[in-house]
């Protein structure tokens, strides 16, 4: 497999383009059907959710269960007073070896890469990014007349300034500070956040042009007077983000973001990011120590990841 993500070819004939549109519609349909319940309340049993993945391989289902177990292990250790600040998100891109900077060699099934060995380059090819935009925009702007609106889109333009603390401790290295500014509404106040990484899971997927990173973090509101914001920022990220939600039927939302990053005393570069974030309702399961219901939300989250990666594999979809 190539060390770089595969970008769909521009030399498609008209017949293939028709097939691609049908394949995209199929994925959109699966996104509509991927939900826990009509009210976002958890199922009474994880068994029903696992049945929805019966078309997946047994190995994929077992891997999802394994990820659920690992995630719960770290979430269960978070202090109750911090549960309201938990964020779980998944970014897509390519996992590269920290030593060689080449894409990690795949196994014959999904596996978790140790953080000390790899890192996720959270940038997808621009053409793939545009395909995602087109797919989701069509569902947002042209909902079915016979069905309720399935996808809702919100567009935001922001600038994040990222700060670092002069703290060499382990906790200090896992912490960053962010000041966010709304570029379209100057009347809104700046927001200040301290972000503490709890755990990252780097997932290398075989036979896929996209890998993923699941991040569990704490995002804690801060004040402008916090010591970290007295230093100069280490980088700025100007973002044009489209956020898609799914009628409260899926306990997650999808972000497509074009990012221009400027590092201090360095050059600018542009990236295209695709990420999924769990909606806050999952925090209720942690407060209640309800592992079974959390697994339902987490499996829905992982199933969405599978659909996103499938949508990226246009060549594979055209043959099905």
Swiss-Prot record:
Q: Which SUPFAM superfamilies match?
A: CYTH-like phosphatases
Q: Which is a Gene Ontology cellular component entry for this protein? A: nucleus
- Asked if Nucleotide-binding is a keyword of the record, the answer is no
Keywords assigned: Cytoplasm, Hydrolase, mRNA processing, Nucleus
* Stretch forming the signal peptide: none
**Known cofactor(s):** Mg(2+); Mn(2+)
Query: Do the record's keywords include Nucleus?
Result: yes
Reaction it catalyzes: a 5'-end triphospho-ribonucleoside in mRNA + H2O = a 5'-end diphospho-ribonucleoside in mRNA + phosphate + H(+)
* Annotated Basic and acidic residues bias: 13-23
Region ranges (Disordered): 1-23
**Where is this chain's protein located in or outside the cell?**
Cytoplasm; Nucleus
GO MF annotation terms: mRNA 5'-triphosphate monophosphatase activity; polynucleotide 5'-phosphatase activity
Which Gene Ontology terms describe the biological processes this protein takes part in? Answer: 7-methylguanosine mRNA capping
Q: Where is the composition biased (Polar residues)?
A: 1-12
Recite the UniProt cofactor note for this protein. Magnesium and/or manganese. Specific for polynucleotide RNA in the presence of magnesium, but becomes specific for nucleotide triphosphates in the presence of manganese.
Q: Which family does the record claim for this protein?
A: Belongs to the fungal TPase family.
What the protein does comes down to: Probably involved in an RNA processing event other than mRNA capping. Releases gamma-phosphate from the 5'-end of RNA to produce a diphosphate terminus.
Report what the protein is called. Answer: Polynucleotide 5'-triphosphatase CTL1
What is the protein's species of origin? Saccharomyces cerevisiae (strain ATCC 204508 / S288c) (Baker's yeast)
Starting at the broadest rank, the lineage of the source organism is: Eukaryota, Fungi, Dikarya, Ascomycota, Saccharomycotina
């Amino acid at each position: 497999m190539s060390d770089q993500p595969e970008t769909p070819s521009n030399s498609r004939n008209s017949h293939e383009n028709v097939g691609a549109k049908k394949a995209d519609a199929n994925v959109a349909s699966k996104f509509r059907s991927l939900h826990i319940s009509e009210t976002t309340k958890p199922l009474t049993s994880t068994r029903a959710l696992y049945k929805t993945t019966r078309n997946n391989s047994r190995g994929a289902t077992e891997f999802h269960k394994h990820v659920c177990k690992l995630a719960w292990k770290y979430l269960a250790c978070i202090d109750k007073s911090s549960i309201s600040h938990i964020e779980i998100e998944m970014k897509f891109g390519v996992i590269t070896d920290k030593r060689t900077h080449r894409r990690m060699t795949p196994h014959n099934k999904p596996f978790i890469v140790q953080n000390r060995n790899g890192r996720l380059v959270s940038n997808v090819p621009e053409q793939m990014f545009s395909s995602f935009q087109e797919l989701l925009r069509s569902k947002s702007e042209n909902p079915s007349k016979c069905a309720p609106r399935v996808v809702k889109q919100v567009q935001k333009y922001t600038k994040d300034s990222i700060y670092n603390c002069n703290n060499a401790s382990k906790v200090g290295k896992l912490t960053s500070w962010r000041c966010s500014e709304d570029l379209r509404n100057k009347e809104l106040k700046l927001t200040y956040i301290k972000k503490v990484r709890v755990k990252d899971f780097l997932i290398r997927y075989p036979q896929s042009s996209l890998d993923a990173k699941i991040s569990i973090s704490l995002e804690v509101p801060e004040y402008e007077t916090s010591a970290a914001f007295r230093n100069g920022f280490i980088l700025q990220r100007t973002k044009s983000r489209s956020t898609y939600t799914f009628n409260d039927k899926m306990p997650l939302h999808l972000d497509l973001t074009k990012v221009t990053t400027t590092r201090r005393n360095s050059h600018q570069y542009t990236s295209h990011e695709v990420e999924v974030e769990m909606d806050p309702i999952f925090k209720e399961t942690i407060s209640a120590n309800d592992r079974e219901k959390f697994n339902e939300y987490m499996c829905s989250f992982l199933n969405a990841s599978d659909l996103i990666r499938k949508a990226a594999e246009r060549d594979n979809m055209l043959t099905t």
